[in-house]
């Protein structure tokens, strides 16, 4: 067990050891309680056959290729350029470009041209059928209303988000209150295939209450009755997820439709 909130020197050493064993696969995180992580031996929860399988990435190049594919798959599409989506990979620009070249030549990723964008995006070949289905309008998926967590893979590359949707998002949790444009913990609002605004929900788990401090819609969005109902339904779903009751209604501001809906 280690407690993330304890920064004494003795706990830093134990934390480093536990995290290294976790990275090596010797330990896994069994559960968390607040800021405390409880570890256990991986062999107590995973089969011996799985633990003894050979490494699927026998060399550094194959490991880099796997990590690039994993990031592309998590976001859906990514470009081969400097991006926050590559944070933590420890790759140079040359290494990243070499990995993209190998993956494209081997048919594991495909370049996609997006209207009004000069830089191509790359998608996993296995996701191409889904892209074709959506592009051709053959999907039976229903439009959804969701609040995106600030660290959701869809938001990893905020320059890409702005290029695709014209939506500029900044996570202001570390921004001094006097300098925030919106709120402490705002979440982008996904409505169908559009990012239409930001919402700031606050959950008081001790009191079991979730409230909404504010909603900011994009300039071209008018909160129609249908939209307001979708927002309120999503807020109530978020409250249930957090084990809270919702005490503040999201009142429709007017009965207009979203422009260009």
Predicted feature residues:
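Long, low-complexity intrinsically disordered regions
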Residues: 1-146, 152-155, 160, 167-171, ...
């Amino acid at each position: 067990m280690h407690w993330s909130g304890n920064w004494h020197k003795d706990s830093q050493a134990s934390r480093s050891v536990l995290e290294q064993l976790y990275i090596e696969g010797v330990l896994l995180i069994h559960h968390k309680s607040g800021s405390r992580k409880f570890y256990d031996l991986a062999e107590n929860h995973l089969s011996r056959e799985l633990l003894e399988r050979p490494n699927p990435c026998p060399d550094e190049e194959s490991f880099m290729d796997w990590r690039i594919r994993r990031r592309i798959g998590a976001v859906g599409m990514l470009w081969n350029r400097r991006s926050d989506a590559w944070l933590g990979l420890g790759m140079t620009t040359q290494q990243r470009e070499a990995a993209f070249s190998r993956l494209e030549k081997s048919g594991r990723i495909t370049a996609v041209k997006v209207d009004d964008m000069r830089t191509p995006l790359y998608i996993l070949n296995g996701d191409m059928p889904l892209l074709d289905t959506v592009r051709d309008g053959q999907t039976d998926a229903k439009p959804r209303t969701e609040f995106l967590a600030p660290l959701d893979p869809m938001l990893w590359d905020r320059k890409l988000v702005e290029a695709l949707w014209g939506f500029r998002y900044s996570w202001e949790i570390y921004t001094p209150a006097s300098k925030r444009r919106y709120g402490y913990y705002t979440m982008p609002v996904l409505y169908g295939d559009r990012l239409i605004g930001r919402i700031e929900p606050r959950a008081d788990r001790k009191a079991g209450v979730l409230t909404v401090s504010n909603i900011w819609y994009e300039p071209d969005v008018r909160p129609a009755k249908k939209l307001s109902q979708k927002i309120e339904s999503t807020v109530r779903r978020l409250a249930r997820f957090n084990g809270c009751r919702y005490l503040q209604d999201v009142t429709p501001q007017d009965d207009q439709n979203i422009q260009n809906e």
